[in-house]
Structure formats: C-alpha cells, structure tokens
C-alpha cells in the first residue's frame, strides 16, 4: 500500500479522485443489522466519496453478476483501486489488482458513523 489514507481519515479535496472505490453493494448492505436500504447505501456512499475525494462506484447485480463486474473492472481501471467486500472468493479474485480491500462491515459502520 502506498500510504493511502485509511477509512475515516481526513483528506484534502481536489479535482483528482484519490482512489476508485468499487463497492460490492449487496455485501455491504447486508453486513449490518438492520440492513442498509438501497437508497440509503447510495446516499451514504455519495456523501463518503464527496467528503474524501474518492470516486465511489456502488456495484449492484444487473444482467452481469456483481462479483464478475467488480473483478473485471479492477483489472480494467487505472489504479489506485480499492474494493469493498467481505466476500472471500471475490477478495481472492481481486487481491493482485486492488491496492486495498476493505471489509463490508467495516465500511458500513464507517458510512453510518
């Protein structure tokens, strides 16, 4: 890791995103009780991204499985890329390309802090 600030650390905003953060939406949504609603997760991620200057992309299941999309995008996008998931299989698939992998529960708690 190249000295990237951790979750919750203060950063100076600028026009360049510090990292592209790919969020495994269903994994994060279901990581706390009560579960985070879809709209609430989108709103919280947008607020978190704005406050920290990151480009956060919340990935939902569509015609492409979310895990497959995240694994593909982490290879295609320019670093630094952070992945938010607690899914062991997905973590294995992205570990060589992600600068940082954040657990879904940790991220959900940070969003609600």
Name what the model sees in each region:
Residues 13-113:
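Nuclease catalytic cores that cleave nucleic-acid phosphodiester bonds
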Residues 1-17:
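N-terminal amphipathic/basic-hydrophobic helices that include classical n-h-c signal peptides
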């Amino acid at each position: 890791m190249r000295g990237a600030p951790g979750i919750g650390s203060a950063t100076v905003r600028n026009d360049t995103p510090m990292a592209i953060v790919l969020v495994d939406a269903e994994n994060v949504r279901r990581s706390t009780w009560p579960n985070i609603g879809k709209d609430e997760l989108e709103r919280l991620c947008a607020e978190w991204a704005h406050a920290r200057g990151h480009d956060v992309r919340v990935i939902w299941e569509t015609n492409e499985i979310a895990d497959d999309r995240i694994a593909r995008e982490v290879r295609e996008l320019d670093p630094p890329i952070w992945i938010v998931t607690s899914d062991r299989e997905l973590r294995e698939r992205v570990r060589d390309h992600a600068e940082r992998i954040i657990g879904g529960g940790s991220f959900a708690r940070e969003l609600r802090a």
